[in-house]
UniProtKB/Swiss-Prot annotation:
Gene Ontology molecular function: any one: rRNA binding
Taxonomic source organism: Adiantum capillus-veneris (Maidenhair fern)
Gene3D superfamilies the UniProt entry points to: 3.30.70.330
UniProt-recorded name of the protein: Large ribosomal subunit protein uL23c
UniProt function note: Binds to 23S rRNA.
Locations listed in the record: Plastid, Chloroplast
GO-annotated biological processes: translation
Coarse class of the protein's main subcellular location: plastid
Keywords: Chloroplast, Plastid, Ribonucleoprotein, Ribosomal protein, RNA-binding, rRNA-binding
Subunit organization: Part of the 50S ribosomal subunit.
Pfam families: Ribosomal_L23 (PF00276)
Keyword Cell division: no
Amino acid sequence: MDKLKNQVITGKSIRLLQQNQYTFQVDLKLTKTGMKDWIERFFDVKVEGINSSRMTSKNGKKKNKLNITYVSYKKMIVRLKKNYFIPLFMSQT
């Protein structure tokens, strides 16, 4: 379970739980297909789609005064097919 760091809990992610979408913070090297295969095997569910984004933490400056953006983590929103849910989060309302 080292690919999945933790669940992201924000106002938006709680609203997405009602639409059967789960938000995770994952390893930076993890791809969408890798995440899909891992989620389907580990939780025994069917994944309909995945959205991913690389989240930035801070900006830095180099000697030549160019702005550099550091990537701190990757966030994935996993959308499951109907009648499937991840029992860990108990999102069924």
